[in-house]
Amino acid sequence: KSEIKSKRKKQLFFDPSQPKMPLAPGVPAVYSVALATKTDVKKAVKIAKDDPEQWRHTTLSERHELLSGAALNMRKRRGDLIGTAAAVCGKTFYESDPEISEAIDFIEYYPHSLRLMEQHTSLKLSPLGVVLVIPPWNFPIAIPTGGVAAALACGNTVLFKPSPLAFPLGAEIAKCFWDAGIPREALQLVCCEDGEPIQTLSGHPDVDTIIFTGGTHTALKMLEKRPDAELSAETGGKNATIVTAMAD
């Protein structure tokens, strides 16, 4: 059991294998997460913009070493991540295990690919600034880790806003990075509701880039509110599939 203590509004997480609410008296919450307010969100964005730890000025070699440590932490904590995904999201061990492997691959891949890009002397590589990562509920390990790792590898400060259904799992992922030495000011975990706080976050003028996976309608709303932001959106689609006589 893990708890983030605060006077703020809390979101409780119960064992998904148990009957739905109302639960029997005395059934404990698996996690209790304090939710960020609109004021908290604004403060987080300011910290990300100010970059007090000077993450943007670190070298790729320094970032690569720290990210390698984060990947190692994720390897060591595979069981904890699988357990949290089951306890909070109801994901089976069979589903979570390969997702963790994919997350580790992401962390290892991005700094390595940047090293290859650095070999092109005609390119000038520089961070974009503040990156907001908003992943979905159904792949709560691999997709957020990929966005966070890519942004950090490039020297950006990151605001990581997990799905409301996976806040505790997002915290466990963030710990893998923090415990490797990546500053909490460079990677901030923002757990907020989908109302005014998240609108403030995604619409904030100091957020330079948004990495979003979710509904097409939501992505279009983000683009409408912040047309000047760099938006990398992976959304749902209704692509046609054509089966010809050549298929088995």
Model-derived features with residue positions:
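Terminal low-complexity tails and localization/encapsulation signals of metabolic enzymes
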Residues: 1-46, 50-53, 57-73, 83-84, ...
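Rossmann-like NAD(P) dinucleotide-binding subdomain of oxidoreductase/dehydrogenase enzymes
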Residues: 86, 90-93, 112-248
